[in-house]
Amino acid sequence: MAEVLVLVEHAEGALKKVSAELITAARALGEPAAVVVGVPGTAAPLVDGLKAAGAAKIYVAESDLVDKYLITPAVDVLAGLAESSAPAGVLIAATADGKEIAGRLAARIGSGLLVDVVDVREGGVGVHSIFGGAFTVEAQANGDTPVITVRAGAVEAEPAAGAGEQVSVEVPAAAENAARITAREPAVAGDRPELTEATIVVAGGRGVGSAENFSVVEALADSLGAAVGASRAAVDSGYYPGQFQVGQTGKTVSPQLYIALGISGAIQHRAGMQTSKTIVAVNKDEEAPIFEIADYGVVGDLFKVAPQLTEAIKARKG
């Protein structure tokens, strides 16, 4: 059975949830082979998790160069493996970095590219959810080694113990024109889950009315242990920072539960959250488009509904 390369997403010595999802998706094409790219010592704490997720092989590409250059080390490693192992495909998370890596890799190896798929099927077929979830389409990439980016949360991870054979591979020296990292400024981490990794997301829209009123959204999110998101309208109005924007021009999420407070549901927003497993919408406008895709809808004042829900959750937790 042909290998399927999976670029592992990791942070601070731990696997990101999407890595297990990618390994599950890879089984539709062949035998999952995880690819860990990082500085020396990166792979060791990830091995057990990758085996449990189902990785038959783990390629370990470690070098100090990885931390000094943007994107190119991962592209170089994957391109080398694509040439040496002739995989049935390459799966990468549909993050900002992942999409750039995928595009560069596809161009490098002369292969077709499928972006932001919600499922992977036999024969290199990717399933896309388009037009705010109104349509589902299938596409097939040209070439022997399709490069596919998969939306985080779209595929349900199904652990299946893998052999996890470790193989060391070299990280090639960066080209002279590679973008070099000259300085780093870590983002201030909060207590809430990362937006694209969260199981539950509570998002606010223009209907929240002000930055101060977003405390209602945050309170509900904190009661659920959820991440906080915002629509583009809320971000453009200055209600919440842009790094939390959900939608076509923001982040794409696919949590188990998505609660939309005061969000009308423009197609651009729906494009970023339509694959959420369960959608709950609260809006005073009963004609709001968000209700078209909501599993549960409440027509009412979010400033009455959300606090009641927050208190009910706190009471239930004791």
UniProtKB/Swiss-Prot annotation:
Q: Name one GO molecular function term.
A: flavin adenine dinucleotide binding
Q: Which UniProt keywords apply?
A: Electron transport, FAD, Flavoprotein, Transport
Cite the CDD domains for this sequence. Answer: ETF_alpha
Pfam families on file: ETF, ETF_alpha
Q: Does the keyword Flavoprotein apply?
A: yes
Any one annotated GO CC term = peptidoglycan-based cell wall
User: For this chain's UniProt record, which GO biological process terms are given?
Assistant: fatty acid beta-oxidation using acyl-CoA dehydrogenase
Is the keyword Magnesium assigned to this protein? no
Annotated residues for binding of FAD: 257-285
The record's section on InterPro entries has: DHS-like_NAD/FAD-binding_dom, ETF_a/b_N, ETF_a/FixB, ETF_alpha_N, ETF_asu_C, ETF_asu_C_CS, Rossmann-like_a/b/a_fold
* Functional summary from the UniProt entry: The electron transfer flavoprotein serves as a specific electron acceptor for other dehydrogenases. It transfers the electrons to the main respiratory chain via ETF-ubiquinone oxidoreductase (ETF dehydrogenase).
State the family named in the UniProt similarity comment for this chain.
Belongs to the ETF alpha-subunit/FixB family.
Q: What is this protein called?
A: Electron transfer flavoprotein subunit alpha
What is the scientific name of the source organism?
Mycobacterium tuberculosis (strain ATCC 25618 / H37Rv)
